[in-house]
Design a protein with these regions (language model features):
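Conserved acidic
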Residues: 11-17, 25-592
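Polybasic, low-complexity terminal segments and linkers that are predominantly intrinsically disordered
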Residues: 1-6
Length: 592
């Protein structure tokens, strides 16, 4: 049972920050800075690999490991960068230290280091997992100040201002986090976690949860997870060019779609009801038939893709989506298999309404920093309830007893380092996947209503937005549509695939000499902007050179630095069938 937290022991805990400066090849470090709010220190060397004992990274860690501290060490985007340098150095230079890494996808969410002999402990965290934005934007938002300007990064290691640049990064991050923690505790009534999602959950339980939330059965959990789909993202038409009859392409976006969905009654307590009851709140495993139509709305997982096809298939569907598909004349239920239904309750309205008021710019107490915090908290909570039960932890040089008792599996490492992975299945009281599944289903229903309204005039959609030449009714309330580019309309667009498109607007953007929006998720180089012609190159079948920085597993395998590869947009199995004129139709499926 998920119970509210008392919040009696809430307090802001001390912390420290660090930052590194590297050469542009991202393989050698020459400066490391550290700040705790009172004292600032830095270490300098020639540009050297982090595993070199004379490197600035090794100097910093040597000092840090000689000084036990309970303060977590924060670096912004450290889980993808700074902590990876630290890990490479620790593996090769400190054989007496054990390391425990909690990964989040390929990033380091948390890295714990312990001295086997003295049992001193240190903890490295990534502040970007709590505040997901660039340090420049966060500095402007929280402190009204950014990073040092007009720096040539390629020559920074030769620039006398490198010391000023590093110190500003350290002090800026510390000041941002200090203000963040103060606002979180004093204004939001929150409690800090190691990520935005864990912080949102702790905040909800501390100040907004009014009743315990019961656990659900394994049967209900299985069906809820099977009916938990992500957002809908796909193109419907390839290209838009403005003309006399159709002057602009609109981008309509749902105002705070998931917070809007959270204000609805949520599935809480499992009901002892069997059979086919789509009028209830729950999830139904059934075989359906979706007739030919331009815009089917029921989700289908196949070939590692989320499709919205026509045809016949078996799946687990939320009752809200099933009702909408049947009411619109698209779907027929051919066979019922099993189901789970829930008693509902309004459990999030207080949380949403309170935080959303912080985003009201007409409020005389409006503050940009707390507005940003409220937005993060509103969008981070619902997914936490759908967390997976299987977790992985990476261990470097674990004790023999831990290796045996935790049934760790060895990871191959040419470095000759004992590396193991621990996989555990742990059910926590907050794992209530029916809540996450229901909220995302309500969001897809809201998007589907818009897609059905614009029909064949839809060009593209992405979770909570629709690009279309048709008009949708707009408003400022939660869940209503807004025209995202009403002040700078789109007069040309090309949609290649999900998250890969280019838009041309009527005017240049503020503080920019360009009127182009260029998106190609997964095709950029590390810390570099996309080339201006990226989408056109991908559309012609060419590949782009992409790069990524080594992650924790790569370091364990002996790889470090920037890794380059060629990547192209695979169009052999798109979510829809596209025709030569740029129009499309849904795919047909037929499976049980």
């Amino acid at each position: 049972m998920l119970k509210p937290l008392s919040g009696k022991n809430r307090k802001i805990k001390p912390f420290e920050v660090y930052d590194i400066e590297t050469t542009t090849d991202l393989c050698r470090v020459y400066l490391v800075g550290w700040y705790n709010g009172d004292n600032y220190r830095y270490w300098e060397s020639e540009p050297l690999p982090p595993e070199n004992p004379n490197s600035a990274m090794a100097q910093f860690l040597q000092w840090r490991f000689e000084t036990p501290t309970r303060c977590p060490q924060y670096a912004h985007n450290g889980g993808n960068f700074d902590a990876v340098f630290a890990l490479s150095s620790i593996i090769k230079l400190w054989p007496k230290l054990t390391v425990e890494i909690i990964p989040s996808q390929s990033s380091i969410l948390l890295m714990k280091v312990e001295d086997k002999e003295t049992h001193s402990k240190w903890e490295f965290r990534d502040s970007a997992r709590t505040l997901p934005d660039s340090l420049e934007n966060l500095g402007q938002c929280f402190m009204g100040a950014g990073k040092v300007k007009d720096i040539d990064y390629e020559k920074l290691h030769l620039d006398p201002r490198r010391y000023e640049y590093l110190k500003q990064d350290c002090t800026l991050l510390y000041d941002v986090l200090s203000k963040y923690f103060t606002l979180l505790y004093d204004r939001l009534g929150g409690t800090a976690g190691i990520s935005a999602a864990s912080t949102a959950l702790a905040t909800y339980r501390t100040s907004y949860q009014s009743r315990p939330l019961p656990e659900i059965s394994e049967h209900a959990t299985r069906l809820a997870r099977a009916g938990y789909y992500g957002g809908r993202c796909e193109p419907f038409r390839r290209e838009f060019t403005a003309n006399q009859s159709t002057e602009v392409l609109h981008c309509f976006d749902v105002n705070s779609m998931y917070p809007w969905a959270m204000r609805h009654p949520q599935p809480i307590e499992e009901l002892d009801i069997e059979g086919y009851h789509p009028e209830l709140t729950g999830f139904i495993d059934c075989t359906i038939s979706v007739q030919e139509c331009h815009m089917p709305i029921l989700p289908c997982r196949t070939r590692n893709k989320l499709l919205f096809p026509i045809g016949r298939w078996r799946g687990v569907f939320s009752t809200c989506e099933l009702r909408l598909a049947i009411a619109s004349g698209q779907a027929t239920v051919l066979q019922y298999h099993e189901s789970v239904y829930f008693r509902t309750a309004d459990i999030f309205s207080n949380y949403v309404d309170t935080l959303y008021r912080f985003r009201d710019k007409t409020n005389p107490d409006w503050d940009l920093a707390i507005d940003r915090m409220a937005k993060i908290a509103l969008n981070s909570l619902y997914g936490k309830f759908g967390s997976q039960e299987v977790r992985e932890t990476i261990h470097i040089r674990p004790s023999y007893n831990d290796m045996v008792n935790k049934q760790m599996q060895q990871m191959p490492s040419p470095l000759g380092v004992d590396c193991y992975i621990e996989r555990t299945t742990k059910h926590s009281s907050y794992m209530l996947p029916q809540i996450s599944a229901w909220i995302t289903a309500l969001g897809r229903c809201r998007l589907a209503e818009g897609l059905l309204g614009v029909g064949s005039d839809a060009y593209y959609c992405d979770t909570d937005s629709i690009y279309t030449t048709r008009h949708l009714d707009t408003g400022s309330a939660l869940g209503e549509w807004k025209d995202e580019y009403i002040k700078n309309p789109i007069n040309y667009a090309y949609f290649l695939s999900p998250k890969v498109y280019v838009l041309r607007h009527e005017h240049n953007f503020p503080d920019s000499e360009s009127n182009i929006t260029n998106k190609a998720k997964g095709f950029s180089k590390f810390a570099e902007k996309l080339p201006a012609n990226a989408v056109s190159l991908l559309a012609s079948g060419e590949s782009l050179e992409v790069s990524r920085f080594a992650k924790a597993r790569s370091v364990i395998r002996g790889d470090f630095g920037l890794m380059l590869s060629q990547k192209r947009c695979h169009m052999d199995y798109e979510k829809r069938i596209f025709h030569d004129d740029g129009s499309s139709e849904p795919r047909r499926v037929d499976f049980e």
